[in-house]
């Protein structure tokens, strides 16, 4: 079945080190925490944070240097503290809803959460169990060991439920490991978080994949409930001429399989404007590409990628062509160049977002050795073979409790067309755990 032996190699790749706490570090943290107004309304928590972390309360504990208590407070809603503190789009979520931000800079919530997560690592703090009566004989299978599956597993195991994760790879973490480059998220942080989840009693079966060596009907017979959390890992395509040429890759597959070609002295074009596009561009640059170009059809202020990540990419030499669209990839057998067309942004009736429209006659070509599509993700076609209702876009259909058309099976995260962030995936996982526990209490 696999024992996760590969996990050691993957999770011990060199990455940025955590900042060790010293006097100066503590002073900066205290200054950041003192800036918080401890609002009673808590828009940062109730409106901004997908996980509804009790932000004012954990920051209050930091002010009083009660770091263990701050960690306990965060534990009530999340098990990904040091991770979300680093990679969440804080400016669009918690910090974007901070009252301080109305007339100035918001509280640096991300740094404070990361600080508490790091404190827990340095002081070997564990997740606390709160076992409920009559749950210890209940069994749940979770398909997928990414942020959503891991979060669901942790919140179930805390209550005493027997949880088994079925993971298609030989390591846990999902996109936390292969989808987010080491320079953004150190893998020792991911490993520590997963180790603590496994210490709750969660079991893992590696190299298990639905549709191949794992049968959902057999799992139904063995478990009380099943949670599908294996994500949407197939890169979307533009369906343009030349997209099947040698040298055209999907961004998700490239990051996941880490099977990059030799980029040295090559020109690489990335199509997209999200964090995957930025991550791929910065990764390719680090691997020696001569020129890295991102093509994005809208304006800079409309890029869904984090502002800081975009800025960092540009500082590293990544060129971004805003308001451009790829219309054709040219080459005989292999990519030689791409044809671009400039766009203008127009307000279409009924749309709240400006739409890009190609400017006729503005076509031009750009040399390219490789083209990487980073246009978002879609679910694998085999989802249709699970015997569950799906939407027209091939997402699994669920009700408000995340139950599928089979009430015994739940689904969440990108499988149901989620919002594409780690925090939202984790929120789905926590909600599913809570809903399953409520189901158990009925019988």
Question: What does each model-identified segment do?
Answer:
Residues 79, 146-148, 171, 274-276, ...:
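Residue-level detector of alpha-helix initiation sites
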Residues 116-134, 195-213, 235-287, 390-405:
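Glycine-rich dinucleotide-binding loop and its adjacent helix/turn
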Residues 162-165, 169-200, 204, 256, ...:
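Rossmann-like dinucleotide-binding cores of NAD(P)H-dependent redox enzymes
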Residues 206-217, 323-334:
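A conserved short coil-to-beta-strand element within the FAD-binding core of flavoproteins
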Residues 244-265, 348, 352-419:
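FAD-site-proximal beta/loop scaffold in flavoenzymes
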């Amino acid at each position: 079945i696999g024992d996760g032996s590969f996990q050691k190699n993957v999770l011990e790749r060199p990455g940025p080190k955590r900042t060790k706490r010293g006097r100066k570090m503590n002073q900066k943290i205290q200054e950041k925490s003192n800036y918080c107004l401890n609002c009673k309304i808590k828009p940062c928590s109730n409106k901004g944070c997908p996980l509804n972390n009790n932000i004012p309360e954990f920051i209050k504990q930091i002010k009083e240097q009660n770091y263990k208590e701050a960690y306990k407070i965060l534990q009530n809603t999340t098990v990904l503290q040091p991770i979300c503190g680093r990679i969440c789009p804080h400016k669009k979520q918690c910090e974007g809803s901070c009252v301080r931000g109305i007339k100035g800079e918001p509280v640096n919530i991300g740094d404070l959460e990361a600080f508490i997560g790091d404190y827990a690592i340095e002081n070997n703090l564990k997740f606390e169990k709160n076992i409920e009566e009559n749950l210890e004989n209940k069994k749940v299978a979770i398909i997928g060991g990414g942020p959503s599956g891991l979060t669901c597993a942790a919140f179930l195991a805390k209550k005493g439920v027997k949880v088994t994760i079925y993971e298609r790879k030989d390591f846990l973490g999902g996109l936390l490991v292969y989808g987010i480059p080491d320079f953004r998220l150190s893998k020792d942080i991911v490993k520590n978080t997963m180790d603590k989840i496994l210490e709750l009693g969660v079991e893992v079966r590696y190299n298990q994949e639905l549709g191949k060596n794992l049968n959902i009907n057999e799992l139904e017979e063995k478990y009380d409930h099943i949670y599908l959390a294996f994500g949407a890992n197939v890169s979307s395509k533009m369906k343009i001429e030349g997209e099947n040429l040698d040298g055209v890759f999907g961004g998700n597959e490239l990051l996941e399989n880490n099977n990059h070609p030799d980029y040295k002295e090559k020109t690489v074009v990335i199509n997209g404007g999200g964090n995957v596009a930025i991550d791929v561009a910065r990764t390719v640059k680090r691997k020696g590409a001569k020129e890295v170009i991102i093509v994005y059809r809208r304006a800079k202020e409309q890029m869904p990628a984090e502002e800081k990540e975009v800025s960092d990419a540009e500082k590293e030499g990544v060129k971004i062509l805003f308001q451009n669209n790829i219309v054709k990839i040219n080459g005989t057998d292999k990519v030689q160049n791409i044809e671009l067309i400039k766009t203008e942004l127009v307000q279409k009736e009924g749309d709240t977002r400006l739409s890009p429209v190609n400017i006729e006659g503005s076509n031009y070509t750009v040399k390219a050795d490789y083209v990487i599509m980073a246009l978002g993700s879609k679910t694998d076609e085999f989802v249709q073979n699970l015997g569950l209702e799906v939407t027209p876009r091939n997402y699994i259909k669920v009700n408000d409790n995340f139950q599928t058309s089979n009430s015994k099976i739940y689904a969440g995260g990108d499988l149901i067309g989620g919002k594409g962030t780690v925090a939202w995936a984790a929120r789905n996982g926590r909600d599913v755990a809570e809903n399953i526990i409520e189901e158990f209490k009925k019988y």
